[in-house]
């Protein structure tokens, strides 16, 4: 039997058992005696016996994911697409507040490694990276945040970010004069996630920083090893310090 169907069947059996025992349940699972469980009083009244005692706290609540699976709730991939549609909707009917809420939801979804890997399949890399250029500071901030989350400890997404031109954009955002500190710090976070243990991204980031007047080399003149966390930290610290001076 399907796992979800099995869980729903168990819940149904527990609920039916409770009903047969003459119990009703509050929404929090606490049992409540029937109204006629106590002795009746008054002329002509007939006494009734107490309702049977039932141990336990009633049927366990059904897992929402089980119900969603059984009854056609949206998948997480569909939720990701829907969130991006809200974020990029040009209609004035979609408020800025709703866009930022959608961004929060999107970021939480791509914390899951499998969901982050779906960005390519769902064609979401391009719109996400393009939001680094958005006129709204908070939109740029959330775009950098989501990119940092998507590529953290994930070479597959690190490769896609680099291939889609995201690394130069993040370096530009992290070092851009006039950009707010919070946006620069979030772009730095995204770069930190993008370059660690992925040499191609480290090399591109170093080249972009060099173009902007900062040489990223170790003492012997060689490139920074992306697997050397101490050296990577030194590079990232340069960007963090520049962000503080914004």
UniProtKB/Swiss-Prot annotation:
<feature type="repeat" description="ARM 4">
    <location>
        <begin position="214"/>
        <end position="244"/>
    </location>
</feature>
<dbReference type="GO" id="GO:0071629">
    <property type="term" value="P:cytoplasm protein quality control by the ubiquitin-proteasome system"/>
</dbReference>
<dbReference type="InterPro" id="IPR000225">
    <property type="entry name" value="Armadillo"/>
</dbReference>
<dbReference type="GO" id="GO:0005829">
    <property type="term" value="C:cytosol"/>
</dbReference>
<feature type="compositionally biased region" description="Polar residues">
    <location>
        <begin position="23"/>
        <end position="40"/>
    </location>
</feature>
<keyword id="KW-0677">Repeat</keyword>
<dbReference type="InterPro" id="IPR011989">
    <property type="entry name" value="ARM-like"/>
</dbReference>
<dbReference type="GO" id="GO:0005783">
    <property type="term" value="C:endoplasmic reticulum"/>
</dbReference>
<dbReference type="GO" id="GO:0000774">
    <property type="term" value="F:adenyl-nucleotide exchange factor activity"/>
</dbReference>
<keyword id="KW-0963">Cytoplasm</keyword>
<keyword id="KW-0810">Translation regulation</keyword>
<comment type="similarity">
    <text>Belongs to the FES1 family.</text>
</comment>
<feature type="region of interest" description="Disordered">
    <location>
        <begin position="23"/>
        <end position="63"/>
    </location>
</feature>
<feature type="repeat" description="ARM 3">
    <location>
        <begin position="155"/>
        <end position="196"/>
    </location>
</feature>
<protein>
    <recommendedName>
        <fullName>Hsp70 nucleotide exchange factor fes-1</fullName>
    </recommendedName>
</protein>
<dbReference type="GO" id="GO:0006417">
    <property type="term" value="P:regulation of translation"/>
</dbReference>
<dbReference type="InterPro" id="IPR050693">
    <property type="entry name" value="Hsp70_NEF-Inhibitors"/>
</dbReference>
<dbReference type="InterPro" id="IPR016024">
    <property type="entry name" value="ARM-type_fold"/>
</dbReference>
<dbReference type="InterPro" id="IPR013918">
    <property type="entry name" value="Nucleotide_exch_fac_Fes1"/>
</dbReference>
<feature type="repeat" description="ARM 1">
    <location>
        <begin position="48"/>
        <end position="92"/>
    </location>
</feature>
<comment type="function">
    <text>Functions as a nucleotide exchange factor (NEF) for Hsp70 chaperones which accelerates the release of ADP. Required for fully efficient Hsp70-mediated folding of proteins.</text>
</comment>
<feature type="repeat" description="ARM 2">
    <location>
        <begin position="113"/>
        <end position="152"/>
    </location>
</feature>
<dbReference type="Pfam" id="PF08609">
    <property type="entry name" value="Fes1"/>
</dbReference>
